[in-house]
């Protein structure tokens, strides 16, 4: 299977998000890369489902709470930007203050 660098990145984010979900199920708090991956995966999958950009920007800020991440992680993440493929093309989605 030959994958482009972008496809490899998408798979890596998806896999990291799966690990993050499993850790949350076990009650383990997420670190920085896991939190970013989970939010990014939410946006990418939402775009694939055809949800509008504005909806994903708002909903992306409710994927993870402060209680679900390690101390200091929420303060480290101000914005998450994800290039996602929508039915009408690729768009950059920015989730502001994603961990509240």
Swiss-Prot record:
GO terms under cellular component: cytoplasm
Gene3D superfamilies reported for this sequence: Urease, gamma-like subunit (3.30.280.10)
Residue spans crossing the bilayer: none
Catalysed reaction equations from the record: urea + 2 H2O + H(+) = hydrogencarbonate + 2 NH4(+)
EC class of the enzyme, as a word: hydrolase
GO biological-process terms attached to the record: urea catabolic process
Protein localization: Cytoplasm
Stretches assigned to coiled coil: none
Signal peptide: none
InterPro entries from the UniProt entry: Urease_gamma, Urease_gamma/gamma-beta_su, Urease_gamma_sf, Urease_subunit
Molecular function in Gene Ontology: nickel cation binding; urease activity
Pathway where it operates: Nitrogen metabolism; urea degradation; CO(2) and NH(3) from urea (urease route): step 1/1
Keyword Ligase: no
Enzyme Commission number: 3.5.1.5
Protein keywords: Cytoplasm, Hydrolase
NCBIfam families (UniProt xref): PRK13241.1 (NF009712), urease_gam (TIGR00193)
Xref: PANTHER family: UREASE (PTHR33569:SF1)
Quaternary structure annotation from Swiss-Prot or TrEMBL: Heterotrimer of UreA (gamma), UreB (beta) and UreC (alpha) subunits. Three heterotrimers associate to form the active enzyme.
Family the entry assigns: Belongs to the urease gamma subunit family.
Protein name stated in the entry: Urease subunit gamma
